[in-house]
Amino acid sequence: MTPPSSPSSRVLPLAWLALVAAALWGVIWWWQIGRAVALPEAPSSRVACVSYAPFRKPGETPLNIHAYVSPERIDADLRALSERFDCVRTYSQGFGLSAVPAIAQRYGMKVLMGIWIGRDPVLNDNEIKAGIATIKAHPEVLRGVVVGNEVLLRGEQTPTALAQYVTEVRDAVHDTHVPVTYADVWEFWQHYPEMAKVVDFITIHILPYWEDEPVEPRDAVQHVADVYARMKAEFPGRAVMIGETGWPSQGKQRRGAAASLVNEARYMREFLRYAGSVDMPYNVIEAFDQPWKREQEGTVGGYWGIFDVDARPKFSMQGPVVEEPRWLLGWWAGVLGAVLFVLAAVWRREWRSRKARYALVLSGFACGTALAWQFRQMWFACRDVVEWAVSGTLCVLALLTTIALARWVAARLGGGPTRGMPDPRARFAWMFGLTLYGLLLVFDGRYRDFPLGLFWPPALGYFIAALLDAGRSWVPTAEERFMACLMPLLAIVTVVQDVGLNPASWLWLGVNLTLGAAALIAWRRAVRLGTHEPQAAYQ
């Protein structure tokens, strides 16, 4: 046991300020995602056309070539969609989707039917044969046929080969008078304008979130209007349809383009107002959230739906929108954390003083709200039992580490004896984990979320403990000192990659600076006291 020694009077206010600020941050963050946000209203709740993929249940994915969706399931989906949409767009003839036109006809819906073109010529030929048969069987239901979706973007066919596929379908169904098109990101029509010669109308995708220069929500619809006008000018006399446009409700922010439910609702409402004002053919993406896309595109890939995976509308087209209706659970998590931290320490004499209890309450509340924040992110991001197990284990470790740190900090602030820092291997592990994830964000961060709620509690705990440590409770190893310098540098790179427009990257920088500063403060004190001996990594 370390005898009580009062921390410097200069650091006490800073330690208390850090605890109060962390608790207030938890209060404010949960409150702001729970407030109702007034948005422009859509002219109607009906939408002209929506992308339809039925793969919304656990384990369903078109990446499984043997996947099959029954006609009964498609019927149930289209019956629900017919209440809000006049048309659905499909992307393939496989997986049972060739039944969509016949079923859509029952509900008075039109279909923008897709024929999937990929790299395999055999699969392409099978798709085309099935598509031609469907077109000839149900021409009156089809608003158009899309031969290939973003094939040039994926680099799976040359423009010449793709044009041959489109022409093959167009010639085969000429007598049905069903128009044939190809769909791709708008820039690729600029790169390959010759594709316009083989289609009846031009179908462009405009996704402001995914632009090379991401567009902020407030400017997104104006961006769509500008691009649409530009494409009309570049292809004079040709009909141009927006084949995909939308906004994600969850996932990583790209520069100023924040994925959120409020922003998705804002975008859809403003886009529908714009589309109605120019009488423009369009299709929005997409009907249902698609969990399988999270494997390819991270969290954000799974949350472009207007309906969730249970076929429930995620937001209305009129009235205010709330980002998180269950926001009070975040506050309750803070209260639970405060109670847990007090119960974990109150049985020892050194934590019974009033100041010590205040410190435990503030620490527990801040930790509880932060881990609730992390759990909310996990709710949207985790795809399977393994990911839940790994993420849950890390959260438990963060909780246990923070409890141990809070007990030590509370004893120092309360003037009681301390019993040493938590296991130094835990400290090293958190620094190593933060460094490793920082490297992943820098070199492979396009689809990775910022796990802020996981790292903030231990980072802040170690920082406050370093401020209050008057002895040699923590002498950082050489490896820890190296990571203390590297972590902020990596975080600065993430800020620069988002050109300073992403608040999450700034918070990530704050986490790295906080934990890095803790190590450097401890080292500076050890040098001053002459307790710094050559250190190596913990065995």
Model-inferred region functions:
Residues 48, 248, 255-318:
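Substrate-binding cleft of secreted/luminal carbohydrate-active enzymes
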Residues 50, 88, 145, 202, ...:
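Conserved, mostly hydrophobic/aromatic
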Residues 51-128:
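N-terminal carbohydrate-binding/catalytic regions of secreted carbohydrate-active enzymes
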Residues 64, 100-179:
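Substrate-binding cleft of extracellular glycoside hydrolase catalytic domains
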Residues 107, 113, 143, 149, ...:
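Aromatic- and acid-rich polysaccharide-binding/catalytic face
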Residues 115, 170-190, 237-243, 280-290:
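Aromatic-lined carbohydrate-recognition surfaces of secreted/lumenal glycan-active proteins
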Residues 210-251, 448-453, 477:
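Glycoside hydrolase catalytic-domain groove-lining segments
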Residues 351-539:
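Alpha-helical transmembrane segments of integral membrane proteins
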